[in-house]
């Protein structure tokens, strides 16, 4: 029989040339481990942990077991502070970039980490943690466990070591593609990020779309900025946006940009969601945000008296790349956006929390909106009929 190091050579070749065809990273690890066990490696559990760039997630953990396949979990930043992580071999490997091995079948094995006792109780006889070195110097890690009596043989350890470098290359390519998606989603939004990642990056690349438009603003922000310490102001702004963004996303909207204390979002209209459905969803998101902000204003000392204004409109917008040279913005423009901006200012003058255009109400139906009157709007020749919520009057919030 061929030694394991020779048997896994075909697996290494697949990892280098064939793994890229798998659509999901967990599928790569599953097939890798299945190929290795078929080649004779006595694997009981394999783990790969790769750090990422994400505002809420420190990294992704892939755990393969022959009975469950590969299970993926996202690790929050709190993971780095947990004692179970701090007291693990992973920290040693991440800090030193060196492999770690404990042959747990050996009665004299050094049990210098709590996890080793847990592994031995599970019947693990050998445990290897190998660093995955990325080209930028970052160190991630993989772990390999067996229940084979006596642990891994020297040839099996050699076979595992031969996999580490190609596994690191595959993991890095997939990790950076995911990082690119994470960063684009974080800073330009999911739909816009997917468009950019798909290659829509030339200046002037735009698409005309139908959308409900959301433009909101914090009332009295200048006064708050003048009275609050800078960090308290930032914290308040974040909590203020926390009241809006989840509601927008849950109702099918896409946040395009933050403008100081302002927020621009769209609710795209397509074959699956028509005008009336989208406008009703945008209005419900507005109500949810209003209620959340009212609760924040009542409970937060710094947010006492916090006020919110929102304009809702519907129309055609140009969605795409606008800017200069190699500094572009993926946003939306057009007369419909301009009108939404004017209505948002009008809402402040009228003491209204939510103001909607006539076009929006035509598509939304009543929805609890009532006419307020016609008003002159800068930049538009005709006066605009505007609507407000029936359940609030002037200075409702």
Show the residue positions of the predicted features.
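Cytosolic regulatory/linker segments at or just downstream of nucleotide-handling modules
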Residues: 317, 340, 346-397
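Regulatory cytosolic signal-relay segments
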Residues: 156-208
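Short hydrophobic beta-strand micro-motif common in sensory/regulatory domains
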Residues: 125-133
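Alpha-helical scaffold within the catalytic cores of cyclic-nucleotide enzymes
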Residues: 238-252, 269, 273-310, 335-344
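Regulatory loop-to-helix N-cap segments in sensory/regulatory domains
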Residues: 145-161, 332
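Regulatory sensory and allosteric helical modules in signal-transduction proteins
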Residues: 67-125
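Catalytic NTP-binding/metal-coordinating core of nucleotidyl cyclase/transferase enzymes
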Residues: 200-284
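GAF sensory/regulatory domain recognition
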Residues: 48-79
